[in-house]
């Protein structure tokens, strides 16, 4: 049961919920009040657009009342200039302070991930986080030990052997953390294989997390080396507790130990191609 309910004392019969329903299951009968037939409920993709679009706050669904939603005003979103500055000013951070992100901030960042877009609104994402620097230290130590064991056993793919051999030696001999960059936290987003587009869902979630985290003053970096290591050393993926059939990617984050007072300069316009229909 999707519990689609319309408060008839508020409903103006404007039809916006009908027009915006992607599954086209909301209908207006002779009385003009929107409704959903029981046999159509299985087609609902649970997007809640009907609740969000109703100007009179007359629609509730899944037992969720519109009064509990966040009101959106003209100035609720960042300005275009703010977004351009954020995208241009976002940097991959590879220097971190040896401190935990505050639990309250981390909670906010993780909770908002429930709002990231996913294909067909499947929302089949798992967010695996290391939220404490001591836990990260232990995970880092285990990761380098597993990498070193794989190097010694000769079980690494040839194209990764020299790189991870160097990374393991740098950690063992100099304490240089090439893979995790000394970050106190790690987020791995994974998607189940029954997702409509698992790889895209994972990338979108991390992109949203990155921009939100950097707005909160945190540093982030996409950890392709972590994924490379997990693919080369399966025991490391098991150590992270990831389901074996999930698509995944990782991001390091924490309080930055570096500040960038200006953007870099890139000419992206040269890569724009207009399609002439």
PLM features: residue spans?
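Small-aliphatic-rich amphipathic alpha-helix that forms the alpha element of a beta-alpha
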Residues: 12, 109, 113, 185-187, ...
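Iron-sulfur cluster-binding cysteine motifs and their immediate structural context
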Residues: 16-35, 49-66
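Short microdomains enriched in Cys/His and/or Lys/Arg
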Residues: 36-53, 69-88
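Extended interfacial segments that mediate partner engagement and assembly in macromolecular machines
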Residues: 71-114
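C-terminal helix-cap and adjacent tail motif
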Residues: 76, 173-174, 244-277
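Glycine-rich, charged/polar anion/phosphate-binding loops
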Residues: 112-114, 170-175, 234-238, 257-260
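Short gly/pro-enriched beta-turn/loop segments at secondary-structure junctions
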Residues: 122-123, 180-184, 215
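Glycine/small-residue-rich phosphate/adenosyl-binding loop
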Residues: 129-200
């Amino acid at each position: 049961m999707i519990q689609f309910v319309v408060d008839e004392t508020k409903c103006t019969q404007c039809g916006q919920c009908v027009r915006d329903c992607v599954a086209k299951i909301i209908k207006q009968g002779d009385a003009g009040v929107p409704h959903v037939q029981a046999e159509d409920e299985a087609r609902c993709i649970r997007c809640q657009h009907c609740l969000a679009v109703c100007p009179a706050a007359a629609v509730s669904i899944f037992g969720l009342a519109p009064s509990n939603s966040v009101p959106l005003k003209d100035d609720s979103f960042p300005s275009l200039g703010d977004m351009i500055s954020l995208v241009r000013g976002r940097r991959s951070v590879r220097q971190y302070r040896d401190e935990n992100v505050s639990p309250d901030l981390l909670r906010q960042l993780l909770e908002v991930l429930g709002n990231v877009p996913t294909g067909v609104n499947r929302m089949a994402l798992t967010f695996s986080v290391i939220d404490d620097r001591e836990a990260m230290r232990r995970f880092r130590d285990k990761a380098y030990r597993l990498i070193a064991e794989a190097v010694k056993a000769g079980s690494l793919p040839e194209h990764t052997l020299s790189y991870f051999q160097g990374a393991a030696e740098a950690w063992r001999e100099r304490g240089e953390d090439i893979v995790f960059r000394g970050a106190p936290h790690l987020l791995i987003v994974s998607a189940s294989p029954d997702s409509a587009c698992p790889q895209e869902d994972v990338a979108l979630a991390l992109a949203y997390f990155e921009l939100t985290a950097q707005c909160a003053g945190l540093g982030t970096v996409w950890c392709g080396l972590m994924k490379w290591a997990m693919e080369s050393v399966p025991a490391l993926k098991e150590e992270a507790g990831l389901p074996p059939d999930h698509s995944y990617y990782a991001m390091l984050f924490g309080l930055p130990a570096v500040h960038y007072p200006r953007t870099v300069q890139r000419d992206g316009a040269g890569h724009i191609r207009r399609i002439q229909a």
